[in-house]
Each structure stands twice: as C-alpha cells, then as structure tokens.
Amino acid sequence: MARVDFWHTASIPRLNIPALRMSDGPNGVRGTRFFNGIPAACFPCATALGATWDAHLLHEVGQLMGDESIAKGSHIVLGPTINIQRSPLGGRGFESFAEDGVLSGILAGNYCKGLQEKGVAATLKHFVCNDQEHERLAVSSIVTMRALREIYLLPFQLAMRICPTACVMTAYNKVNGTHVSENKELITDILRKEWNWDGLVMSDWFGTYTTSDAINAGLDLEMPGKTRWRGSALAHAVSSNKVAEFVLDDRVRNILNLVNWVEPLGIPEHAPEKALNRPQDRDLLRRAAAESVVLMKNEDNILPLRKDKPILVIGPNAQIAAYCGGGSASLDPYYTVSPFEGVTAKATSEVQFSQGVYSHKELPLLGPLLKTQDGKPGFTFRVYNEPPSHKDRTLVDELHLLRSSGFLMDYINPKIHSFTFFVDMEGYFTPTESGVYDFGVTVVGTGRLLIDNETVVDNTKNQRQGTAFFGNATVEERGSKHLNAGQTYKVVLEFGSAPTSDLDTRGIVVFGPGGFRFGAARQVSQEELISNAVSQASQASQVIIFAGLTSEWETEGNDREHMDLPPGTDEMISRVLDANPDNTVVCLQSGTPVTMPWVHKAKALVHAWFGGNECGNGIADVLFGDVNPSAKLPVTFPVRLQDNPSYLNFRSERGRVLYGEDVYVGYRYYEKTNVKPLYPFGHGLSYTTFSRSDLKITTSPEKSTLTDGEPITATVQVKNTGTVAGAEIVQLWVLPPKTEVNRPVRELKGFTKVFLQPGEEKQVEIVVEKKLATSWWDEQRGKWASEKGTYGVSVTGTGEEELSGEFGVERTRYWVGL
C-alpha cells in the first residue's frame, strides 16, 4: 500500500507478488532516473498534441508510449495529464491537452487506449483541479459543483468512457477544503460508484497527508516510498478501528488487481532500461510535431517559404531545441533537432544566423562547452563522503557527464554514508571569444564555482529561495571573470548535497539529496544584438524569427508571473518586422499563450509549442510547405493577461483560490462577454482552402430515461477547394436554448479530422450522445439535466464559414453516471 522507493511498489516474494515499476509520464517515458538516466523518446507537449485535434494520432502516440514503457521496464505510465488551463500562467499548463473538457477527454481517452493496448497501465492525472503551482500542496480550490462537473471532471469522465484506465492519480491540492487524496466524495462516490470504475487510485508524490482519512476515502497507494503515513501508522489505525479491516482489504485488492492486470507484460523485477529510438518512431515523432504547428496568420501567402532563396534565421529559440517543459515532463531525449538545424537541412540556398536577443532565465549550461582532462566532451563528477576541506578524501564514485544540470533525487550509491555528501565537478573551458563572462550556480544544497582555483561564484551562505528543481533550489547566484580567447581554464564546482544548505525548507518537499546547475555566457549588449539582427534583416529576402519560452520559463513548481516573452524579445521582433515587414515570418514556441504586442506588424505567424525530439524538423516541414498545417488552437490566446477569466483569482490567498469564473473557462468566457481574444480557441489556418456544405442532423427516438444509445449524428460535405492537399478539422458546437440558469453561448461537443487531395470531397460524420450534447449539472438535484427545447448546431473549421442546424429535446430528463 506504499512504495519501497520513488518508482517501485513493494514485492512480497513469499506470496509471489512482484514489485511494479512506474515512470513519468506526460510526454515521454523517462525511466527510473532523473539523474543520468537512459535517453527516451520525447513527444510534443500535451498542448501541442491537443492542437492536432487528431484522436487517431493520439492513439498512435499512446502505442509508442507503451513500447517506450516496456523498453524502460515500466508497467505503469504516469500520464496523461488532463487538468484544465483556467489561466495562461499555470506552470504545468503545457502538460494538459486543452482548456475544453471534450477535446481533452477524447484525446486522452484515445491516448490511453493506445497505451493500454500494449498492456501498459495508463494513469489519468491529476484528479482534480490541480490547475496551479502556487502553494499546490496546501491550496484549496473553491469551486462550485456545477463547474467541477462541467469543466474539471469532464475530461476524466469522457476519457473513462473511451478507455477505463488502470490507474488514477490524485491531485496535490484540496477541493472545497479537503485534500483530494482523502476526499471520499471524489474518489469513492464519483470515481468508483457513479462512474463504476474499479482501478487503482494513487497519490501524487508526497501528496498523501493522513493515514485513516486517505485509506477510508479510497486512496489505494501512497506515493512514493518509503511510507510516511502507512506501515506502523496504518497498523495502529486498524487496531484502533480508525480503519476497518474490510476497507483495508479493498485497498489491497485494488493493488493486487493491478499486479494481475500488468502481469502479461512479463517484465521482470529490476528490469534493465533500454533505448529504442527506432526509425518508425522518429517518423511518428516528426509527424506529430508537424501536425501540431498552428498557422496563426499568413497575409499575402508569404508562407510557405522558398527553399532555393537565401534565408536569415534570427532569435533565441533558433539554435536551441525547446523540446519540452520543465519538471515531471522533462527527460533526457535520444536526440534533439533545433529549428535552425531543421531549416538548414531543407534549404538549398544559404542560411545565415543572427542571435537577435538572448532569452535565458538562467545562464546557458556550461557542460557542453567543457572538456575533461583527457579531452572528452563534458566534465568529471567525483563523489566523496567528506567536504573539500577534508584531507585525504576517499573517492566513492566517478561519472562522466555532459549536462551541467542534475536533479539527484534518485541518485544512489551504497558507498555514500548518508544524504550528506560532496561532489567535485571538474572540466576545462577554452573560450572562442575574449571578454567578461558571467557564471551562475543554482543548487539544492551548496555550491562554489572556481576558475583556475579562484572563487567566482559562492552559493554556500545566505542562500536565497528560488524556483528551480520543483521549487527546492536557490536562486542562481552569479559572478564574472574576464577570459581570453584560446586560453584554457580549469572550472570546478564544489557541491554539497541538500542537507548542507541553509535555506528554510519548511513547507517544501525536498526530493532526495539535492541538485545542481551551472552555466555561463559572455557579456554582450542587448542593443548590439538587436541592431545587428535588424541590419541583416533589412537586406534579407526571407527572414524567420524563432522566439518564445523554454523549460526554464514553463515548469512544474512555479507559475509564470505574466504572459510576456522574455526580456528584449518583443523589442527585437518589433524592430525586425519594421525593417522587413513583407518577408519576415515569426515562429513562436511556448506551451501556453503569450502576449504579442507586435502581431499587427507581422504578415506570417506560426505557433510551434514544445515539439519533442523532432521539433526543428516538424517546424521546417510546415514552413517550407512539405506539410500543410492543419492544427487548431486548443487554448485561447488573449490579447493581454487582464482579459482572461481567472485574472482576479489565480494564486493562493490565505490558503485558497476561488474559481470565480465558474463554468466560463476559456472560450466560454470570451464568447459570453464579447471579449475579443487575440486568437480564439479552435483557430488555425491552412495553405489550402475548404468548403463545408449540406449539413444534416439526425436524432434517435427518445426513451423514458436518458442513457447511452440516443445518438445525434451530424453529417457534412467537406471539399478541398484549393491547390494543395491538406487536412481539415471539422468542429461540432451545440447552442443551448434559454433555461433557468446561465449557460455558455455554445460548447464544443465533437470533432473529426479529414485529409483531402485538391478538389476532393468527402462526407464527414460526427456522432454525439444526446445526454452529453445537451446536459448541464443541476446542483439542487445533484444530477445532469437535459432540458426540453430546441438546440442549435454550428459546424466550423478553417476559415469563417459556419453551417447551422438544430435538433429538439422533447422532454426534460435527469441522469447520473458515466
């Protein structure tokens, strides 16, 4: 009923009950190690997959996720995440598919179906209202039952209809005053009884807060091990009748059922972790990346670009691969492709680069620029039980690393005596340019950076709390030193593990023995960078700006403070557009919405999210027209932060956050209040054009009770009226009649994707159950209400064309269940 470590349940050899392995998660199967782990496939982030609106693609993604899980020896994947982006600022917003429960639930259900067809258990998370990072362990989400049902529980409900998952993970937070991991109404009454689901409920890591209340509420498994709340505490609760034995039996039975469920995989205990990286997997990752790219704007059809004309690439996201967000979603990918690499690989003419601006939150990692004493790329990582001041220290471990950032939460070495240990990281740096270099150190623990035995950064005393490493780390402390081009310098980071820190860790879950990050960059004038980019752009025949966010800016453990791009980025984009407005394409990468004060100047804009291993190739495929963009926004992009419905209620205030927008989340709010967004939910252009015609709505006869089996079927003719093959996403919206309660103007109820050659026409069919298409949650009755009346139907897609129809509901009926 609790784990033995971070990733395994306890085995009972005498009963032939094996341990089970679990692994994150949202956009790739990391395996059992955050630190120095086996590389894995990195999928586009969830908002990117949400932008595909492609249930079949998500099924394929789930199947590959299953193969990756088996390769890592993992029985259970801790994903997908299907929380709702009630604010653009949520640190984990990129982990969820959409702001709408129907889009999110259908995609998640197909993802889980593909995963579980491989025999691997899927885990829907985080159940429920885990929609912010601020005080996430303690905050109480104050939400009406109507909003809880119609918005936040809906994606879980719809996903379960498609694929009852083997597992569900509870959220960290409270809902209306009670932590979800001990909330009987949510776990037992709704999830198990009303939805008739019989899988395993686990807590999020350190998201169990009681013994008896959690057991009695229905929490089967405390995560992670070793237990804090079970073991002897649970034995005492049983002996004192705080927990009945039959309740304990139910919790154990669910764990054993999961053991039996995954048993056909045949994964042995302590299975070795392997890398796949197969050609067909790379093809799928590239296709997913390309199909997620949203064409936001394309005046004068300046896209697609010409491969045979010179190209100037500008921007901070060009030569790095922003492949994923931060936190649980992060992993070590098999490889990455930057946008610059993707463009260069396709172009047949010259491709130049100008930095334009830097956008790092912390200094770029120094590790890739270092060499070991014997000339290998990277640095040595030497572990000791004693601090550097101790004479004749004994070396207990030595590793060779490339990445100068590591979260040691799962680092184990039997020669280490305790959580308190010390590491010397040593490498040699030969700069290519002379100048003053800034160096930065961020630690969970302590760190001192020395260059040729001179202390440049001291992060060992008077430490300041930062946000890195799930909020465990210090801020990045910096120092500077002048370096000469061509001269080699010895760089050493003296690191002490987490217990050596003087940070106040009360209220913070400290994951393991610590973490480190060290980086460096040559000081350079921002004005100089922008001016150089503007000068080059003014003479260029084709310009692509790559800008946006990275895992530093969007990460678990920390919400964003604003929607703006990193400092200097907007100025750079604006000035480049002024210099060459007719030939400049702006490509942004972020997992959630950003402000664009310069957008009126741009003729072409694409949004490319965090695109996984193949992000650069996927972007280039769209920019050059090898893939016709078909993606649609899964979240609304407001003009400014103040326009979003959660603006007044997004953070914990005295331990609670009020979901004051009620059911008016995302597009529901903008349409109800006539607040025009920058780009609406469902927006996305194509290189071709489509027509939609001949909408027909058919319904089945009504029964006395409203159950499954009363489908509403919409058929429509879709034709590719352009000259380029492409895919159209057909969206079905339902407009409710006037009722006794306020309802959204319209709500998405179904969608489908169809690929058409130029001139080709197909009939498209979307089927929705009447109860799902018409109902709202009646708090007085505690039931869904499908009210009598005439319901409007709207069918939309690429462009402004909208088809309208209607259907009737003859009598008001109420229902509960899945």
Curated annotation (Swiss-Prot):
GO terms for biological process: cellulose catabolic process. Its main location: secreted. The active site is at 204. The keyword Secreted applies. It catalyses: Hydrolysis of terminal, non-reducing beta-D-glucosyl residues with release of beta-D-glucose. Residues 374-534 form the PA14 domain. One of its GO terms (molecular function) is beta-glucosidase activity. Its EC number is 3.2.1.21. The keyword Hydrolase applies. Glycans are attached at residues 176, 453, 472. Keywords: Carbohydrate metabolism, Cellulose degradation, Glycoprotein, Glycosidase, Hydrolase, Polysaccharide degradation, Secreted. Beta-glucosidases are one of a number of cellulolytic enzymes involved in the degradation of cellulosic biomass. Catalyzes the last step releasing glucose from the inhibitory cellobiose. Belongs to the glycosyl hydrolase 3 family. This is Probable beta-glucosidase I. The lineage of its organism: Eukaryota, Fungi, Dikarya, Ascomycota, Pezizomycotina. The gene is bglI.
